[in-house]
Amino acid sequence: MQHFEVNYDGLVGPTHNYAGLSFGNVASLANAKATSSPKHAALQGLKKMKALHDMGMKQGVLAPQERPDIFALRRLGFHGTDSEVLYRAATEAPAIFQAVCSASSMWTANAATVSPSADTANGKVHFTPANLTNKFHRSLEPQTSGRILQAMFNNGRYFEHHTHLPDNEHFGDEGAANHTRLCREYGHAGIELFVFGRYAFDSSKPAPKRFPARQTLEASQAIARLHGLSEDNTVYIQQNPDVIDQGVFHNDVIAVGNQNVLFYHEQAFTDTESKLAEIQRKFGEHPLHFIKVATEQVSIQDAVNTYLFNTQLITPPDGQMTIIAPTECQENDNVRSYLEQLTQSADSPIKRVEYFDVKQSMRNGGGPACLRLRVALNDEEIAGANQNCLMSDGLFNRLNQWVEKHYRDELAVDDLRDPALLEESRTALDELTQIMKLGSVYPFQQD
């Protein structure tokens, strides 16, 4: 039996815009109110997916969510026709209105936490959608995320789906952006690392002061229980509160892991040495590489500005571990120099770096790692999943045509109130569910 890590990238939605909604995300705030290009963003994302597919990687696609979220606005007391609801909300509560238009579901690292069958007690792949309670615009996502994931992984023999955690900050969960897995091979039992920002029930513990800690220890522990993980294959690590206050809002902005490699900044965690020792002890006697980037090599500011760690660390079929990095890393002399030294070092397990232009996503604070949800699967599980969500030459061409047909070239924040945009988006998503054989996953399809 063969085993793979499949990257499911989020397809950028038709309302991709720069509203600056994410406090604690430096890039999101810096580009607030700029004009976006939904079409360009979606095509950029598809190009990256196709490139990884062409490298021999298993690559999937995760559908976007329905926006503007008319149903959320109606729950908040805006009545009338859809056009009237849009107008009233945009006029009377513009901040709320912009939030329900967000295309943030494109960052599928926040869609869910996934545990592969090799790690779980019942031998199934487990999915728990993230509740994303810290940001209103993202807290609207988990129910639809759950329906989409169930439509993608729709065979109960292999897959088990859980309801997202309670919608409360005590159980704030940001999904795979605060979770990584170390293993020898993808099909072998691994160590799942849960990184959290604060203790929900103990205010005496360290916590950031400037920006919020979005993930709690208690949420991470709950996910591990739901997924049937054990003490022997889990490690809980607190993120350094000081780096959260410098704009590191998720662990995947300061660390990334793949197979037997953990690539991290020296300021990423609290109690680093004891936690690395715990990882090593639970990993066993097999080779394990901890690649520490010192502050004198790359500053926190450079790490955040270039998203050095919000890169994809992958193992293509040729076995040459590769970093998939945004072009911002290439454009920063210091970071580019570091990556050149890293990949040229004889004792480094990371051998290549490939640069991709994902600037439409980067301007909203999401790099290559934000755009993908990693799912370790064996060939039987892949065969048991929805085949229409796996990248191929045919799907790539079909989705490019779909984007060209339905997406706008430019979108300003003021354009979000246009009733035509809602209809354009619904028409596009209805067609997409047919292309990807998802069924009626969107609220407007169930209305």
From Swiss-Prot:
Look up the EC number in the record and give it.
Answer: 3.5.3.23
Assembly and interaction partners: Homodimer.
- Is Hydrolase set as a keyword in this record? yes
GO: which molecular function terms? N-succinylarginine dihydrolase activity
Reaction equations catalysed: N(2)-succinyl-L-arginine + 2 H2O + 2 H(+) = N(2)-succinyl-L-ornithine + 2 NH4(+) + CO2
Query: What start-end ranges are recorded for coiled-coil regions in this protein?
Result: none
Which family does the entry's similarity section mention?
Answer: Belongs to the succinylarginine dihydrolase family.
Provide the transmembrane region boundaries.
none
Keywords, A to Z, come to:
Arginine metabolism, Hydrolase
> Which pathway features in its UniProt record?
Amino-acid degradation; L-arginine degradation via AST pathway; L-glutamate and succinate from L-arginine: step 2/5
The record's annotation in NCBIfam families points to:
arg_catab_astB (TIGR03241), PRK13281.1 (NF009789)
The free-text function statement in the UniProt record for this protein reads:
Catalyzes the hydrolysis of N(2)-succinylarginine into N(2)-succinylornithine, ammonia and CO(2).
Under InterPro entries, the record lists: AstB_sf, SuccinylArg_d-Hdrlase_AstB
Q: What is this protein called?
A: N-succinylarginine dihydrolase
From the UniProt record, report the name of the gene that encodes this protein: astB
* Annotated organism of origin: Idiomarina loihiensis (strain ATCC BAA-735 / DSM 15497 / L2-TR)
